[in-house]
Amino acid sequence: MHVTAITMEDTSFPYRLGTECAEEIVARLGERAASRYLVVCDTTVAALYGRDLVARLEKDAGPAVLLTHPAGEVHKRIGTVGDLAEQALAAGADRRSVVVALGGGITGNIAGLLASLLFRGITLVHVPTTVVAMLDSVLSLKQAVNASFGKNLVGTFYQPAEVLADTAMLRTLPARELRSGMGEVVKNALAIRPSMIERLAAELRPDARYEDAAMRWIIEESVAAKAQVTGADKHERRDGLVLEYGHTTGHAIEHAARGEVAHGAGVAIGMIVAAEVSRLLGHASGDLVGLHRELVAKAGLEGSVPALVDPADVKHWLTYDNKRGYMPCPPAATPMVLLSAPGEVLRSGPLPLVPVPLELLGRAVDALAAPAGQSAGAERLSPAPA
């Protein structure tokens, strides 16, 4: 497995990436000599990889137990963490146990929060099985779950000891999840690493059929992009906030859809909304909006708010965005990450955030929720009166 040292200010952990490397993953976990391996995954991943990993660990590493939770965003709740904690303790977990987060971003957050809470903190190792997890969520110290008021509102910061990623696990992903992952890849290219845009445009596949070599490049570039902004901001409260590009509206869409819209799909729409808002405010050109639409389409993602989502619900959840409080912002506005060009982030002082009137943001959301056959283009939007 190829290893990259992920350095965040005063802390560091190894990110190991390979293909067809299940045996090495078990060997690496075995080196930790855990009293018990607590393999956390959802019920879908349990059938695909969880039971096999537990059996391999039992054979070659030490005692292991499978802790499962129901699949889906609606189960990313503090109650799920509590249930898993009870399962772990009943199975004999102690301070020398290791939590193995086997799954996507939802499981990674649930397991990460679990590891931070058991005995006030035990070892956490990520074994990501989705694109979003491999190139985004496992590279963050943020461990959070949802509340009734919005996404990722309850959580903490906790460092994994290691990440062990096998791209072969992506072969069992449905196309929906692969496309979702590409939403985060497009974000990295547009907001952080514009040097990857040209090749990314050539590598993206609307049918979500990716060769191993292309996927390895996509993951490696995205890991480098994220490390570029978290190296000096491990808590993602300064420059690291750029990783929230597209997430203001994206999270609101996800929450309004009650788990029916994948994370990366929501982010893709959120980025187009953000580009439209930047254009309306006079910071960006229509070309930037067009580039967003082009890359989102090449990834096989929708460029408009899904019909199953009520735009009024989206606008409601925008008022609970988790970036509120980072900067002074009137009640009728919300802080957003906006671009003036690829890789060029607008700032208010030292932060990559600008206040956006909720009325203007709401009009951009409405424009992307146009009925089929009706344009949601720039002609339907005009700047708010001065």
From Swiss-Prot:
Active-site residues?
K142, E244
Requisite cofactors? NAD(+); Co(2+)
> Its catalytic activity?
D-glucose 6-phosphate = 2-deoxy-L-scyllo-inosose + phosphate
Cofactor: how and how many bound: Binds 1 Co(2+) ion per subunit.
Keywords for this protein? Antibiotic biosynthesis, Cobalt, Lyase, Metal-binding, NAD
The enzyme's first-digit EC class, named in words, is: lyase
Q: Any keyword Lyase?
A: yes
Spell out the PANTHER family in the cross-references. Answer: 3-DEHYDROQUINATE SYNTHASE
Q: Which family does it belong to?
A: Belongs to the sugar phosphate cyclases superfamily. DOI synthase family.
Full protein name: 2-deoxy-scyllo-inosose synthase
Q: Which organism is it from?
A: Streptomyces paromomycinus (Streptomyces rimosus subsp. paromomycinus)
Encoding gene, per UniProt annotation: parC
